[in-house]
Amino acid sequence: MSQLLQQLGTDNEFIRRHNGPASSQHQHMLNTVGAETLEKLIEETVPSSIRLPQPMQLPHGLSENAMLAELKQIAQQNTLNTSYIGQGYYNTHTPNVILRNVFENPGWYTAYTPYQPEISQGRLEALLNYQQMVMDLTGLDIANASLLDEATAAAEAMTLCKRGGKNKSSTFFVADDVHPQTLAVIKTRAKFIGFDVVVDTDSNLDSHDVFGALLQYPGTTGEVKDLTTLIEQAHAKKTLVVVATDLLASVLLKPVGEMGADIAIGSAQRFGVPMGYGGPHAAFMATREKLKRSMPGRVIGVSIDSKGNQALRMAMQTREQHIRREKATSNICTAQALLANMASFYAVYHGPEGLKTIARRVHHFTAIVAKSLQSAGFELAHQHFFDTLTVKTEQQTDILYTKALAASINLRKFDTELGISFDETTTVSDLVALLAVFGVDNAECDSLSNDIGQDEFAAIPEACRRTSSFLTHPVFNTHHSETQMLRYLKKLENKDFSLTHGMIPLGSCTMKLNAVAEMLPVTWPEFGGIHPFAPLNQAAGYTTLATSLKSMLCEITGYDDFSLQPNSGASGEYAGLIAIQRYHESRNEGHRNVCLIPSSAHGTNPATASMVSMKVVVVKCDDNGNIDMIDLAEKIAKHQENLSSIMITYPSTHGVYEEQVREVCDMVHDAGGQVYLDGANMNAQVGLTSPGFIGSDVSHLNLHKTFCIPHGGGGPGMGPIGVKSHLAPFLPGHSENGVQGSDYAVSAADLGSASILPISWAYIAMMGEMGLTEATKVAILNANYVMDRLRPHYPVLYRGTNGRIAHECIIDIRPLKEATGISEEDIAKRLMDFGFHAPTMSFPVAGTLMIEPTESEDLAELDRFCEAMIAIREEMNKVQQGEWPLDNNPLVNAPHTQVDLMSNEWDHPYTREVACFPSVQAKASKYWPTVNRVDNVYGDRNLICSCPSIDSYEE
């Protein structure tokens, strides 16, 4: 191709959109860090021993338009049949006001988990609404702010039963009418935690001695029955009872809490979130007051701020993996906040009466079809149901199933029965087409429907009918016009800080650009409208997408195979450690159960190791932040016979490329162990090195970090795992789609949160080999630039051999606190006044701040951040010198709100301008925190996890 034609082409044009600093600015930045060229900086930063010998074999980057055209062709390979499969997944209408203003809105999807509550009050309110919605519909005392999927929630509930119960048995009961994908995930969890699982009809529960039981209501085949007596019998034997339930069904059905259930779990998918071939969706868990401190997942609570005003926050964080490590209630980090928010907004928009209308409509459609089929001579497996029928079709099963497929209808197929599940998208014409498959005339259906319409509970037994009110809080009874809803959504969005406002420099979080072109395909119906258990030939587009993405990831990581099933980084860790343990078992070395973990590791690492019954042995780090090789050698020697693995992060969580990483891998391999390399910091590897090249056996990748899936304010995430060939046979399987051994599932669907995979595919396709490698280099340049600008003012805790850092740096606040009395929390809160989200606080070292600017931030934003940090350091000096008292200065009083600015009283030794407009940029474009500093201790001592009364909002 001629030079002119190359210039006229659009290959690689996206790179300059993704990377923040213009190439013309690189030299200024390099001068600041003291490097001649970008390549020279990389040579001084990344050890030569781990540099890739040749570039990745990936195509040139596509333009945005070319990528979207290619991805559209892939999407159109999917076939969108009308789905009646059910089994926990249903078509739904996403209200357009929510689609446009939340799902497609970077103000919602680019925010981070609300660890900084003062700049997160909007999504905290939305998540509190979600908890209230779940509590009301399940009839239980407290709910969390989402889990990964229904099957994972069931597995978490099983372990909660063991933690919170008094029965000494090690056996867990699962009713035989629980969704099969849920049972599969429970079996995986039980095996590696040491529990037995017994599957039987729920009527036989009383004959088993078990610590917990899982029932389904309605059952997977649709049956609705009163569980009260079964639960009472279980309680008599000190057995805790979990009930998997359906939120829409709970609008008409007696809540499981009123039947005595201890725990309720399920999925909020049908509240406005597309099926997406399996996800992402928000699962829920609700429980009794007595179990609240053992419940897994994030919980939003009501507290007060420093002025005594109501403020929301994440409550009871001492249960979580980032604090409790191997003693945590769960390894869950990222959950499904964005999808939980969408579900809560669905309930807010429709309100209780709107939900009743939808539920009645679904139930009446089901009842009409039931009567029509019975009048045509078909027998139903159950007479009581909400939205699902199981039809006894005997020898006609295959014929009718095939006939339905020919009519573009998907039914659920059993050996001699067919399942039919209805949802809010079902129409009268759908019913006519469905009944035609069974040979039922439309006129018959029409005459039968008159009787059914008179009865709200057409096929629900009296003992199972809901009589209690729900969603009585004003928030669910106000915003029912689109104008009202639009303004409510905007009001909440305006309270929160996201990437639309400025840099989010959270270390170990990689808050990079989530480009619009990457996000667009997520809303395409070809990706959103497919049921995860549809026949595989209807998901040809997803198969093509998954195969292509796995190939890309193998090339990037140096691994031989990938599973896309894990739907979070923590889930990926879990799947990876299971693969290691199954590998050892296959070699008759199942006794290997010791997992070495450096003291710098992320809290999910020890929490996950504990979930697979590993013994966690901590390896020390030296004064430079590297693994202490002497201590490592001693620990390996001590545990050689039982050594399973080591979990390392690279670059290390201390923000440096450890020179001896290959030696670490060799030492563990020589002792018979496997190397798990946590992919959290993959953003500093792509194109320069790779886990496989370094010597690792397995890694998870955080697609919501390195590969541009947005954080969504706390999820969704994706944690696919890559493995070397010897571990490939031990990747997760899935029973529904018959993949890879069909067992050891870690998620409810084979491709996990499949509908967000296009985001990462699009990013890689548009960046290509050159762009991905340049992004890594620019991430390193940006981090070193920030470090060198801040180093004269703040101690940098760890640097590599040549004084360089990887993609993030840790500044040490401890000596400054000793000198000034100002803490890392004070700095974090003061940054809000300057218009920034705080860096990561006190991780991986207490009393520090970890900063990761990513490659997407431009030079002006980097300088704005550095100038804010330098200004804060000058404010600390004023405190140290006595110009401002320690208990009354802009740092300890931060953040400052509009109420502070307009207050009639001002008893501070600094001006309102210093408080609220500390920089030129803050004056030009001010982000306002909506509450003062939140009181964490008060919130946990006075735990309230439901929507506050309307009176509490009044002045």
Curated annotation (Swiss-Prot):
It is an enzyme of class 1 (oxidoreductase). InterPro entries: GcvP, GDC-P_C, GDC-P_N, GDC_P, PyrdxlP-dep_Trfase, PyrdxlP-dep_Trfase_major, PyrdxlP-dep_Trfase_small. Its EC number is 1.4.4.2. One of its GO terms (biological process) is glycine decarboxylation via glycine cleavage system. The keyword Oxidoreductase applies. Its cofactor is pyridoxal 5'-phosphate. One of its GO terms (cellular component) is cytosol. Keywords: Oxidoreductase, Pyridoxal phosphate. It comes from the Bacteria. The modification N6-(pyridoxal phosphate)lysine is found at residue 705. GO terms for molecular function: glycine binding; glycine dehydrogenase (decarboxylating) activity; pyridoxal phosphate binding. The keyword Oxidoreductase applies. It catalyses: N(6)-[(R)-lipoyl]-L-lysyl-[glycine-cleavage complex H protein] + glycine + H(+) = N(6)-[(R)-S(8)-aminomethyldihydrolipoyl]-L-lysyl-[glycine-cleavage complex H protein] + CO2. The glycine cleavage system catalyzes the degradation of glycine. The P protein binds the alpha-amino group of glycine through its pyridoxal phosphate cofactor; CO(2) is released and the remaining methylamine moiety is then transferred to the lipoamide cofactor of the H protein. Belongs to the GcvP family. The glycine cleavage system is composed of four proteins: P, T, L and H. This is Glycine dehydrogenase (decarboxylating). It comes from Aliivibrio salmonicida (strain LFI1238) (Vibrio salmonicida (strain LFI1238)).
